[in-house]
């Protein structure tokens, strides 16, 4: 049984105010009867006001004009945002606040593929989605669809990603401004530093707010981590496209950039200009190494099992880091 039920009315147009109410009443009644007892979150997604078509002109269909509908709507939360990205991200926050993971989405058939594309970007495998068709009659019926989307093209997917990225960039930093802790011990030919937990947009308590690691087992999606990384790159002055994290296995493997990348490694070393390497640290110690003579650097995270990793890195004059995160790179020429 779904813990949360979402009804997608985003962008729908209705052919009369009366039919608008009848359709919504039927759908909301069905949801309430089947899910109200067990679902902890019932939600309607819409874009501003729902518009009703009358004689070729658009009138605003105010939901509050129907007493029966108004009473029923009290059982639902309405999320009305100007974009689908904003709507779904707002809903995700509400779902995460309640620690829910089983979600039913009732969506018009022509919008199902579009909805799935947004969900794939904004949610992780922690969540379990099921989809149900919102019954929409297209011929002399109650609802009209403005555009049909049966398949997502590469261009449409790019537009979805751009919409999400634009929205995430507009979000304020949480828990304070972004901070990068540096040391005068490392010469300024290296961009280096340790980040803290402030300045990002991750709102999950255990990840808030500057999470730089995404996982299918976490609620923070890749797009949020990428936005945190973008903000870090802008603040520190490195190229986010040339950013490399360790892939820890709590062993002694070191990736020397330029050689074949191992499947997992607890340290990275490099002498390549313009490349940034980072180690993420939670309960392990992140370490940065910089050799101004060889112009090489490295990062690793070190716990009880990482002694061999540290020795290996010192031999190659590089760095270590882990999940706080630590970052370092050799500045590109110019």
Residue ranges and their predicted role:
Residues 170-175, 180, 186-191, 200:
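Acidic, glycine-enriched active-site microenvironments
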Residues 34-39, 94-97, 233-236, 320-330:
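Phosphate/pyrophosphate-binding loops at sites that engage ATP/ADP/AMP, CoA/4′-phosphopantetheine
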Residues 190-231:
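Intrinsically disordered, low-complexity, positively charged segments
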Residues 10-11, 16-28, 40, 46-56, ...:
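Active-site beta-strand/loop microenvironment that shapes enzyme catalytic pockets
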Residues 1-96, 114:
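N-terminus-biased targeting/localization segments
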Residues 107, 111-168:
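Extended, non-transmembrane interaction/recognition domains
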Residues 222-302:
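Phosphate-centric recognition/catalysis
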Residues 20, 81-84, 88, 111-112, ...:
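Generic structural signal for well-ordered, non-membrane alpha-helical segments
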């Amino acid at each position: 049984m779904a813990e949360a039920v979402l009804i997608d009315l985003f962008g729908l147009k209705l052919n009369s105010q009366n039919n608008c109410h009848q359709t919504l009443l039927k759908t909301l009644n069905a949801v309430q009867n089947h899910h109200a007892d067990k679902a902890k979150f019932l939600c309607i997604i819409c874009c501003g006001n729902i518009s009703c078509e009358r004689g070729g002109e658009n009138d605003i269909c105010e939901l509050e004009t129907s007493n029966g509908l108004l009473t029923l709507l009290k059982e639902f939360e309405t999320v009305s945002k100007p974009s689908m990205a904003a709507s779904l991200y707002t809903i995700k926050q509400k779902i995460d606040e309640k620690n829910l993971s089983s979600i039913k989405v009732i969506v018009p058939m022509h919008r199902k593929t579009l909805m799935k594309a947004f969900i794939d970007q904004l949610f992780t495998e922690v969540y379990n989605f099921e989809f149900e068709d919102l019954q929409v009659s297209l011929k002399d019926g109650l609802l009209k669809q403005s555009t049909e989307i049966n398949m997502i093209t590469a261009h449409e997917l790019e537009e979805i990603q751009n919409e999400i990225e634009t929205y995430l960039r507009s979000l304020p930093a949480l828990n304070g401004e972004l901070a990068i802790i540096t040391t005068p011990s490392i010469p300024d030919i290296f961009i280096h530093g340790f980040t803290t937990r402030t300045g990002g947009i991750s709102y999950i308590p255990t990840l808030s707010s500057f999470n730089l690691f995404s996982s299918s087992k976490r609620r923070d999606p890749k797009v949020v981590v990428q936005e945190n990384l973008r903000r870090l790159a802008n603040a520190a002055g490195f190229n986010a496209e040339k950013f490399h994290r360790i892939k820890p296995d709590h062993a002694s493997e070191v990736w020397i950039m330029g050689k074949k990348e191992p499947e997992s490694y607890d340290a990275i070393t490099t002498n390549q200009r313009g490349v940034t390497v980072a180690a993420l640290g939670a309960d392990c110690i992140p370490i940065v190494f910089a050799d101004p003579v060889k112009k090489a650097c490295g990062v690793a995270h070190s716990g009880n099992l990482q002694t061999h990793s540290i020795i290996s890195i010192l031999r190659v004059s590089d760095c270590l880091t882990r999940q706080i995160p630590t970052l370092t790179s050799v500045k590109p020429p110019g």
